[in-house]
């Protein structure tokens, strides 16, 4: 009996010593990170294509979090896309304000990782950091299928993996919607009778607002409009 107790005691002490020794070792935690360049690092390391959007990100003050770990999807316009955009708005990289740069970055950026395989014809499941949803659709261009984003630009290089998300290169700078649903209906003459009905019922004023860019506060409308 004493012999069995001695063996049991020795085994217990041995286990405690092993446990103590193991617990004293430095624990190496596995973080959910990557050795890939982050989004900002990637665009900055490709100045032949992305020097303009890099300058815009720098001016926006968002370089810090775009170079930190997270889960983002960014539609990155090429230098030629930014050049076209700046000509359209009569601006240069120098004359863009910080607020304008921030809005450009925010309309191209989602706090989610979305591959093109998850795109469907219509609204993406996550709003941009600007607060508006982007829409995508497949178009046929000379026998080649391409993805059109917001009816403004096509994806020219997709699913570029970075340490904090994905990049989809686009050939145009995306622009946020500037008109309310009511204004879009008014601008199309084939909805003239429907517009009158909206005004008569008081709903025209309800949908004639572009409110907060905060996605938590913004109200969204879907109108099934009848043509004349």
Model feature map: region roles:
Residues 2-8, 16-228:
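Mature, structured domains of secreted/extracytosolic soluble proteins
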